[in-house]
């Protein structure tokens, strides 16, 4: 089955066209600057060179038309479309076929993720209307966390506030964490009942997974919570918002921008949100970069222990996403701060670069540590195949 996976943002639209059975990626790309001057499509076919096609993309409808036009060059029919949805709210315990009802849900919960859900809902509607013969599936990033125990998702706020505004932990990166569990389980079977999946990219979250079920995760109502990220501050005292507003004179919108776009590794290092630049700075003695790394290791190890505690133990730790898959130094930094839990990496194995899932801990490590490249598009395509198959 051939599936087109779409990941729409407010001014961008990423796509990947792949075969679920062979995992072959026929083509992938992204439409950038939709609705803004200078829009273009970056497109790659069968691992070939990336082409930049400068086209006017006044809206998402035009972008989708372009994507379908470009994909005509691929000699394979589109059998289904999978839509990544950032926030499924209290509605989606799993992926679902697009209907008037499910599309309505995506819009209803959009105030929780306004930058993403509105655009995603529009794109889903456009695809459904333009290509009525192709099945469309909604794959919410929160669905995997839906069944977290109540003691993990409930916020200790007044019940009527929680109920009226649906303020609770929803988590994010669920599709990636689900893929990591699936892969680790395929490789390790019953040796892993309790996994902490560590998705460390420009956005970062940990997820405690026991026998395939999410027990807790570090992101909360929104993807701002938890770990220190590229430009996001992660968990801080919530009163900071009130204080900055009342005493600092910052508006709520300014604080929102500050905490999401101007904080995290970027703010602490004063150099970059990219871990490669920060590692480089730290190596040449930049103290701010050294502190950014130290804080990243400290918080990641601390929250790892929190995730382990939610399962009363942990068998396997899996690193994934941009930092988790590529930075041996960051993996080592986190693992060093977990030596008290019996985590020990094999330095040689940790240094290996590969696209394959692999073990990087020593045989006597109390927790098996792995690197597992994530593949959210494939996971989405699998859901499409299951629901349409
Ligand atoms: P992601 O959001 O998963 O695409 O991850 C993006 C982040 O991963 C970048 O901002 C970098 O900090 C980090 N990253 C990507 N590639 C590498 C690499 N080769 N070495 C170290 N860090 C990397």
Where are these regions (language model features)?
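Glycine-rich phosphate-binding loop of actin/hexokinase-like ATP-binding domains
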Residues: 144-247
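Catalytic phosphate/nucleotide-handling subdomain of diverse soluble enzymes
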Residues: 210, 216-251, 257, 321-352, ...
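A mobile "lid/hinge" subdomain adjacent to the ATP/sugar-phosphate binding pocket shared
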Residues: 248-292
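Short glycine-rich, Thr/Ser-proximal phosphate-binding strand/loop in the N-terminal lobe
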Residues: 3, 12-56
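Short beta-strand-loop/turn "lid" adjacent to the catalytic site in phosphate-handling enzymes
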Residues: 71-116, 135-137, 143-152
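Glycine-rich beta-strand-to-loop/alpha-helix junction loops that act as flexible
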Residues: 8-9, 84-88, 200-202, 314-326
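Internal helix-turn-beta structural module
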Residues: 290, 294-315, 324-389
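Phosphate/pyrophosphate-binding loops at sites that engage ATP/ADP/AMP, CoA/4′-phosphopantetheine
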Residues: 67-79, 186-189, 304-315
């Amino acid at each position: 089955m051939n599936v087109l996976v779409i990941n729409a943002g407010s001014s961008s639209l990423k796509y990947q066209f792949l075969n679920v059975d062979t995992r072959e990626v026929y083509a992938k790309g992204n439409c950038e600057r939709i609705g803004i001057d200078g829009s273009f499509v970056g497109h790659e076919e069968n691992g070939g060179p990336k082409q930049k096609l400068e086209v006017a993309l006044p809206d998402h409808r035009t972008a989708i038309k372009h994507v379908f036009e470009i994909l005509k060059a691929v000699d394979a029919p589109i059998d289904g479309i999978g839509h990544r949805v950032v926030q499924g709210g209290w509605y989606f315990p799993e992926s679902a076929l697009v209907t008037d009802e499910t599309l309505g849900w995506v819009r209803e919960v959009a105030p929780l993720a306004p930058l993403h859900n509105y655009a995603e809902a529009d794109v889903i509607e456009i695809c459904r209307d333009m290509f009525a013969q192709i099945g469309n599936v909604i794959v919410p990033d929160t669905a995997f966390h839906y069944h977290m125990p109540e003691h993990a998702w409930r916020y200790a706020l007044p019940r009527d506030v929680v109920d009226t505004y649906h303020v609770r932990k929803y988590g994010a990166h669920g599709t990636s964490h689900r893929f990591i569990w699936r892969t680790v389980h395929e490789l390790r079977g019953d040796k892993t009942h309790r996994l902490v999946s560590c998705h460390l990219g420009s956005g970062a979250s940990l997820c405690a997974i026991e026998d395939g079920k999410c027990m807790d995760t570090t992101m909360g109502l929104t993807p701002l919570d938890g770990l220190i990220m590229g430009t996001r501050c992660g968990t801080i005292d919530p009163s900071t918002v009130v204080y900055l507003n009342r005493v600092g004179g910052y508006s709520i919108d300014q604080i929102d921008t500050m905490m999401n776009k101007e904080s995290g590794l970027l703010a602490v290092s004063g150099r970059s949100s990219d871990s490669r630049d920060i590692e480089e700075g730290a190596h040449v003695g930049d103290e701010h970069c050294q502190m950014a790394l130290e804080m990243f290791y400290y918080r990641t190890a601390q929250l790892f222990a929190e995730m382990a505690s939610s399962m009363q133990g942990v068998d396997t730790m899996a690193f994934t996403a941009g930092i988790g898959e590529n930075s041996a130094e960051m993996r080592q930094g986190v693992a060093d701060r977990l030596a008290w839990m019996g985590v020990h990496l094999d330095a040689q194995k940790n240094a290996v670069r590969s696209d394959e899932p692999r073990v990087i801990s020593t045989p006597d490590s109390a927790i098996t540590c792995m690197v597992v490249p994530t593949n959210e598009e494939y996971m989405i395509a699998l859901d499409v195949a299951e629901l349409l198959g």
